[in-house]
Amino acid sequence: MNNEVIMGIDTSNYTTSVALMTVDGQLLANLKAPLPVKEGERGLRQSDALFFHVKNMPSIMDRAKEFLNGKKLVAVGVSERPRNVEGSYMPCFLGGVAAQKSILATTEAKGYSFSHQCGHIMAVIYGAERFDLFSKKFVAFHLSGGTTEMLEVRESGSAFSSQLIGGTEDLNAGQVIDRIGVYMGLSFPAGCELEKAALAYKGKVPRKKPKIKEYAFNLSGLENLAKKMYDDTNDKNLTAAFVFDYLSSVLEDVCNNYEANNGKTVFLFGGGVSSNSIIKNRLKSKFDVVFAEPGLSADNAVGIAALTYRAHNLEK
């Protein structure tokens, strides 16, 4: 029996994540430690996020150790930057890089580095078992609190190359969700609570047509509309349902525009906002879409582990 194991590490602005995988691609562990955010606040400064990653890392590595017992660590991958473009940088990823370098210095494991965004894309491919996407061009949406981008994606080596073709021109989808949630008294991050509120609403959802410029859009208007709706109605469920209906309409419109220009396309959705069942069900009924389970849509290290597995095997 092969006892070799691969590790992935991701230190985003929300979660410290470590994943372990066998050298034949079987997931052993998907470990996460969320970063604490004070009640009423809407996120963390980068310096605070890095501090909490450093604080979280020993305990999450202790949890990982349980899965490493009797096994040999042969490769460690890490997300070292937000996106696969020159100059992409966020201090929070230094926490993961430091952990990886420490492991590489004390073991014979090989090291690999990727972008956080490539990790998200790979996590969805791995979770949905859509490995056929490595042989074709597809469109990926990275929807989170820090990013709302529409990308044309192709395979490049062990990972991906991507071209930014659309997305938000102001607020990110996750930002809007969190701002409205906190405004209504929900805890940060507010996505799960806001989704529960939306699903509890049984009435007709008022619709407001979003303004789309081919593949680009603005979401600050949604924040203003939702806050006014809540001020006028004091109805959390109605407001939550409106928010997710609006976001679904935005994504539906840009997907329609893309297919009008390029023909039938596979649309992949990653990032924490992509775990929302309302958005998923709306788009699933209209397009060829790829979603992963919520645990692989939100920040995780499974995508990084899977990319590391792929890179390690390509070198053999």
Which residues make up each language-model segment?
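Conserved phosphate-binding catalytic cores of ATP/NTP-utilizing and phosphoryl-transfer enzymes
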Residues: 1-4, 109, 113-138, 307
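A short helix-loop
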Residues: 2-4, 8-12, 19, 28-30, ...
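Conserved active-site "lid/cap" helical segment
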Residues: 17-80, 229
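Short beta-strand-loop/turn "lid" adjacent to the catalytic site in phosphate-handling enzymes
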Residues: 62-101, 105
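Glycine-rich beta-strand-to-loop/alpha-helix junction loops that act as flexible
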Residues: 78-81, 144-146, 268-276
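Active-site nucleophile and cofactor-binding loops and adjacent substrate-binding regions
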Residues: 90-95, 111-119, 141-143, 168-171, ...
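Glycine-rich phosphate-binding/hydrolytic loop that grips phosphoryl groups
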Residues: 120-123, 292-316
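A contiguous, well-structured pocket-lining segment that forms one wall/lid of small-molecule binding clefts
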Residues: 192-267, 273-284, 288-291, 309-316
